[in-house]
Amino acid sequence: MSTESMIRDVELAEEALPKEAWGPQGSSRCLCLSLFSFLLVAGATTLFCLLHFGVIGPQREEFLNNLPLSPQAQMLTLRSSSQNMNDKPVAHVVAKNEDKEQLVWLSRRANALLANGMELIDNQLVVPANGLYLVYSQVLFKGQGCPSYVLLTHTVSRFAVSYQDKVNLLSAIKSPCPKESLEGAEFKPWYEPIYLGGVFELQKGDRLSAEVNLPSYLDFAESGQVYFGVIAL
């Protein structure tokens, strides 16, 4: 019931009172009726304000949305997110430690994987779909002394479907030895790691390779030191 209809009912009730009621007793009745009318109007106004500003009313939906998820609902949400992530192409290959002549990548070793369309063909990772990819690689070089000036390079290259030229995506050059070696430096061992990583937009069928210029210096003493990977974002 609206405030206007409440006030209209009160006015009709006042008009229905007999004229003789306006005596000494009628005055008290009129006062009570006026007080009742005031309280009724004030209550209706307060109720209207509370409903208008949303203090009370249909807040059940908002309340339900703020309720914490049950363990079953949380598990379903995490499982759905995990399935979406598991559908993306991913590759992580490791180096063959028996070959010192060239850097050969293997996918069937511990901690290596090819998933969701990624392939390793002719020592290159083949991209299965268009999109953004994180491309990364690490190598570790090891040597004994500096009989001569040594330059070590590590490069990640792309053979695109749109053009067959080899293009370097990532590249780094390091030297473990200064140009002028100190006396006795030729007897000291040295280690030189190189890490490369970046995000690139690749196309289906693109081939990626990771190479070094001096594979004979690679250190395979520990697993996880030389690797190459691609992850779809």
Swiss-Prot record:
Organism: Marmota monax
CDD domains according to UniProt: TNF
Modified residues (Phosphoserine): 2
Subunit comment: Homotrimer. Interacts with SPPL2B.
Ranges in the topological domain labelled Cytoplasmic: 1-35
Domain THD: 89-233
A Pfam entry, by short name: TNF
Example of a GO biological process term: vascular endothelial growth factor production
Posttranslational mods: The soluble form derives from the membrane form by proteolytic processing. The membrane-bound form is further proteolytically processed by SPPL2A or SPPL2B through regulated intramembrane proteolysis producing TNF intracellular domains (ICD1 and ICD2) released in the cytosol and TNF C-domain 1 and C-domain 2 secreted into the extracellular space. The membrane form, but not the soluble form, is phosphorylated on serine residues. Dephosphorylation of the membrane form occurs by binding to soluble TNFRSF1A/TNFR1.
Glycan-bearing residues: 81
Membrane topology recorded in Swiss-Prot or TrEMBL: Single-pass type II membrane protein
UniProt cross-references to PROSITE patterns, sorted A to Z: THD_1 (PS00251), THD_2 (PS50049)
Transmembrane segments: 36-56
Lipid moiety-binding region (N6-myristoyl lysine): 19
Taxonomic classification: Eukaryota, Metazoa, Chordata, Craniata, Vertebrata
Family, per entry: Belongs to the tumor necrosis factor family.
Location of this chain's protein in the cell: Cell membrane
Site (Cleavage): 34-35, 39-40, 49-52, 77-78
Record protein name field: Tumor necrosis factor
